[in-house]
A protein has these predicted regions:
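A solvent-exposed, acidic/Ser-Thr-rich amphipathic alpha-helical stretch
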Residues: 11, 21, 25-92
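Short beta-strand edge/turn micro-motifs at domain boundaries
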Residues: 99-168
């Protein structure tokens, strides 16, 4: 239970009580007194059915009252089952932070309030940042705990089908189509399918790989996750407490198989999604699936979720003379390990995570490696620097930490990451100085916001150093600039100074095309234009077309690391469930005023 004598608890209780009273009054004077002039409100489906952030008290006070009148929020109290209100530092500012709960006419939610003194108003504590997040829909709660299935359908009738019979029937889709078709069986596909399963929404995952988890299993031999285990749980099923801090790719792949079985997810392997079209009148898709035996199946789901990840179609740039090269050329997505290249000469083009890891793997296998840098790259040591952004996950519950992560509005997150970036640069100073002496071109992200914002804005452009940078500094791995190549020849890369970097292998660690290209390939140019830009931050200060409605009704996108997918899948699933239950119009656009 909370210590009600604690100053933080009293302050949070007082503010929430005044907030609820102010929302019920038509006059906004009382409400205005509760918000700091420099304040932020992030609403995740709770009051607006949108995922959006508003900056400044004026913008908040304009939007909040009409939304509150329609959605009728009430019951704002500090949640006694969550982390107690406390004094924290966020984005360089001291604040009182409290987790609260509330409900609306359609659901129940959680939120985070941060209070700071307003020096222009007698140091009165006011809201600096406010999160309101929808947690569940009334009458359609997740089938967990006391809501779990009883199992009577198969455990009490000795003449009827047993559990296995029913599972086979459910996954077979012999005489029905799924409500939701998920394309891709990685962490994003599994996360959204698991969420929808708990909301009783019929969902099928299709993936072209032969085995569940192959999207990780088939990646390069030495790969492990670059962030720590406590950040990377899938929904509902935590990793065992004896798992390593950094999970090997094959271990994660095998966990995906176990997860599908344990969560009873319907999953078709060796199934290619060939394309789909949307019938606006019927409000459903017509999609074509090609199975492993070559047969085709047409389905009519009401929703399609593209869960193929941030990295979609490999990007293979045009490089002068590369077609004349007599050795082996492959994209990094095709690379397995360096065993066959012992004693050989290898060129790796690209200095992101994959390029560095592949160069290190080749060198460790006995190859002679030269890396070519195409553009400046952010480098950060995997420990402790790269893990600083995940510091909150080292304490408290996963549920609380996910909510805290969700609660940070973009502008405060930027400031926080700039501060973290400065700390990382100081910790890594010797390494970074050595790289610059070796001729490596460094950057620190847009406005020095560090690696995570590089990921959120462009999906790459950084490296977590697990040893390759040290090899470059020592000269074990040669480094050259891609701009200094004149052309490739049969022997290798001929430089502008007339020398040649001879090679037997060229690995193109050149990244992936934008997700818009995959949307166009699968659904056509008209739908691609309707959806628009994917990933990166839009004017609403949110990731564009991620975890929310897009410009194309019935088409949803989910991508990101395991933590992003765990959090974002909850928001996406609630929207689909709301549509299926008539709480949200089926054809509403991403930013419609629909409360």
């Amino acid at each position: 239970m909370l210590d009600r004598t604690d100053d933080s608890s009293v302050a949070a209780d007082n503010w929430l009580g005044q907030f609820e009273e102010a929302l019920a009054k038509p006059d906004d004077g009382a409400l205005k007194a509760l918000f700091h002039p420099d304040s932020y409100w992030r609403d995740v489906l709770a009051l607006s059915w949108n995922i959006q952030t508003l900056n400044g008290a004026d913008a908040i006070l304009k939007a909040l009252p009409p939304l509150a009148r329609r959605i009728q929020p009430s019951g704002f109290v500090v949640d006694p089952d969550r982390a107690a209100p406390r004094k924290v530092m966020r984005a360089g500012t001291n604040a009182i932070e409290a987790i609260f709960k509330f409900e609306t006419k359609v659901g129940r939610g959680s939120g985070v309030i941060r209070l700071i003194p307003d020096t222009d108003d007698g140091n009165r504590l006011k809201a600096w940042s406010l999160l309101t997040e929808l947690g569940e829909l009334k009458g359609f709660e997740e089938q967990l705990g006391v809501q779990r299935p009883r199992g009577n359908a198969y455990s009490r009738d000795f003449r009827g089908p047993n559990w296995l019979d029913l599972r086979k029937e459910s996954a077979g889709y012999a005489d029905r189509d799924p409500t939701v078709l998920v394309i891709g069986g990685g962490q994003s596909g599994l996360s959204i399918a698991a969420r929808l399963k708990q909301l009783n929404v019929d969902t099928l995952i299709v993936d072209r790989e032969q085995r569940i988890g192959d999207n990780w299993r088939k990646r390069y031999h030495a790969l492990t996750l670059h962030n720590q285990v406590q950040v990377n749980h899938l929904p509902y099923m935590l990793f065992p407490p004896n798992w390593p801090t950094y999970i090997p790719k094959d271990k994660l792949a095998n966990w995906f198989e176990a997860y599908v079985e344990a969560m009873e997810l319907n999953f078709w392997t060796e199934t290619e999604f060939e394309g789909g079209s949307y019938d606006e009148k019927a409000q459903r898709w017509t999609v074509t699936l090609r199975r492993a035996d070559g047969t085709k199946r047409t389905m009519h789901p009401r929703h399609v979720v593209l869960a193929t990840g941030v990295s979609g179609i490999p990007s293979v740039p045009e490089i002068a003379g590369l077609k004349d090269f007599s050795g082996k050329v492959m994209h990094s997505s095709q690379y397995d390990d360096g065993e066959n290249w012992k004693g050989k000469r290898a060129i790796v083009i690209g200095t992101g995570n994959s390029g560095h890891d592949i160069a290190q793997d080749l060198h460790s296998s006995g190859a002679h490696v030269t890396m070519f840098q195409r553009s400046s790259t952010l480098v950060v040591s995997i420990e402790p620097s790269a893990q600083l952004v995940y510091a909150p996950y080292n304490e408290g519950t996963l549920e609380d930490n996910d909510l805290i992560a969700t609660s940070m509005p973009l502008q405060l997150a930027r400031k926080s990451h700039r501060l973290t970036g400065e700390k990382s640069k100081a910790l890594d100073k010797d390494l970074l100085d050595g790289l610059e002496r070796a001729g490596f071109k460094l950057d620190y992200g847009e406005d020095n916001t560090g690696w995570q914002f590089k990921y959120l804005t462009r999906g790459g452009g950084y490296y977590f150093n697990v040893g390759c940078s040290d090899m470059i500094v020592r000269g074990d791995i040669a480094l050259k600039q891609f701009a200094d190549i004149d052309t490739f020849t049969a022997e290798g890369a001929r430089m502008k100074d007339g020398t040649t970097v001879a090679a037997d292998l060229v690995v193109l660690a050149t990244g992936y095309k934008r997700q818009e290209e995959l949307v166009r390939k699968l659904f056509g140019e008209a739908i691609e234009k309707r959806v628009g830009t994917i990933w990166g931050f839009g004017e609403e200060q949110e990731l564009r077309n991620m975890y929310t409605r897009t410009g194309q009704p019935g088409l949803w996108l989910i991508a990101g690391g395991l933590a992003q997918c765990r959090i974002g899948s909850k928001h996406l699933a609630l929207q689909i469930k709301a549509i299926e239950e008539g709480l949200l119009p089926r054809d509403v656009g991403p930013r419609a005023d629909i409360s």
